[in-house]
Amino acid sequence: MAANIIATRATPKMASKKEHQYCLLDSQEKRDGHYPFSFELKPYGQTGANIIGVQGSLTHVIKMTVFPFMIPFPLQKIHIDDFIGGRVYLFFKELDVQAISDVNGMQYHFEFKVVPVSSNQVELLPVNNKYKFTYAIPEVQYLTPIFYDLSGPLNFPLDTLSVHVDSLTKHIQLPIQNHNLTTGDRVFISGYKHLQTIELCKNNKIFIKCIPPLSSEKIKLYIPKNRIRIPLYFKSLKNV
């Protein structure tokens, strides 16, 4: 008895190529109104105006790599020994479905060794700087990094502040609390090209001599020693 054989053509596999994208998450370009950190990534754009520019698109992401970077001492820490186990963990909120789960429900993507650099900064050295996703991430548009140690989330001193100009004394006054600034610290002022130093810190107010006339509405103060820049590298799959 003859058997009927139905032949089917195998579906051809889609060829794919890998694309590589670098980006630098700069705390001075975080999204407005999002504290402590949240970033918007713009494909084929430039970094600036609260946007992190990326050379290409971040779709079908299969691997993420992080490189060493520095952070200021968190508000909860005073000495290097305050970092429990000498480790800090980094978790990206938008990628929570694919993250390492640890004790007490903590999740993270990267683990770092904490290395002292100065009295107010430490360097984070990745223990394993690559994270491979089990399933490709369809698109990365926003990233919200959260730092932990075994005691809980870490908060950092502000690196960008809005200012008030006293028209009588011609000083810039910053009525803020929990800052880590001292007399002589260098700061940058938007709308004014010269580097300034803090003249006085008193009663939770920082005074900076203002030489040219400045408008309070247009001024922001940038504090270099509190700046955090996270260098990332992404590998994506693209169908061709």
UniProtKB/Swiss-Prot annotation:
Keyword Chaperone set for record: no
Subcellular location: Virion
Primary residence: virion
Organism: African swine fever virus (isolate Tick/South Africa/Pretoriuskop Pr4/1996) (ASFV)
Descriptive protein name: Penton protein H240R
A single Gene Ontology CC term: virion component
Keywords from the UniProt entry: Late protein, Virion
Family, per entry: Belongs to the asfivirus H240R family.
Function field: Forms the penton at the fivefold vertices of the icosahedral capsid. Together with the minor capsid proteins (p17, p49, and M1249L), forms a complicated network immediately below the outer capsid shell, stabilizing the whole capsid.
Induction: Expressed in the late phase of the viral replicative cycle.
